């Protein structure tokens, strides 16, 4: 009698290529041969290319996978259709289900930070492997991290250690880097040209991580604060210069500037200001390097002119997470709304021609008020082995 282990490698590859990434771990466990094959090549690309944006999101201190199929929108022949799917992910080797406060993505790997920064580990969702990272000294609650790699594809972790005893305006920063190849931390004698707020998280692109920084200039009796872009280069282990965003707000203290990425090829920046809260502007990079950036306008939307906005939609909500679909010419914004005793995670799909669609992607656990935070979009799996 033929068993699944008797199937040819080509047939097994075709079967596994049709399985969503988030289900591969369960499927691989049914057969040692299937498990071995999937560790040497990436399956599931057909599923991803055919339909979805696969994202990871932090929701109620847990990591969730989120799949959004946007192929059904802007369909002239039939009603728009979006097929959302969100589910909690069980992380291997996290038996106690440590609550997660931060997650950083790079190259198919997720750097997970436990609440109060008590533990740090790296997770490969495709291979189902984890690696726990031991600190050089104790992790602190104000620490912030980034994940990247150098020109030799050697992965590294950047750590900002903020001095908890100083006040926020004068808080000192120390910077460490963890090298996967040597399994050790090193102290870096580097400082960025501008201030990176301790609550700021970066976006990794092509191995480097980009942050928003704040440049402070002192004019005559006036202190000006300008938001800029800053890159940490994991090859040179240095910060680049402050790069322009080309947004000129009347009052930076009341602006929302959010970073996202486009398939590990480009950066996307969303800008919104309290004074003109109904206007959402998005730009994407046409050139992006540690020392240079150029931008083009992707989309500008006046939400006051959009038809069909739901009653719960507020012009003043802060878009903390978003991604764009260049082909469909839309932006997907994430928020939450409360209906009776339940709070729902929402995705708002918006186009510059007035297109709008509201999608309920799931109930928020514990009725948390904050919307889930997007960790990465258009996830591409990795064969990077994590040896704990």
From Swiss-Prot:
According to the record, the signal peptide region is none
- Domain F-box: where? 1-47
Disulfide pairs? none
SMART domains xrefs: FBOX (SM00256)
- List the Pfam families: F-box, FBA_1
What is the top-level taxon of the source organism? Eukaryota
Q: Which NCBIfam families match?
A: F_box_assoc_1
What is this protein identified as?
F-box protein At3g49510
Organism from which the protein derives: Arabidopsis thaliana (Mouse-ear cress)
Taxonomic lineage: Eukaryota, Viridiplantae, Streptophyta, Embryophyta, Tracheophyta
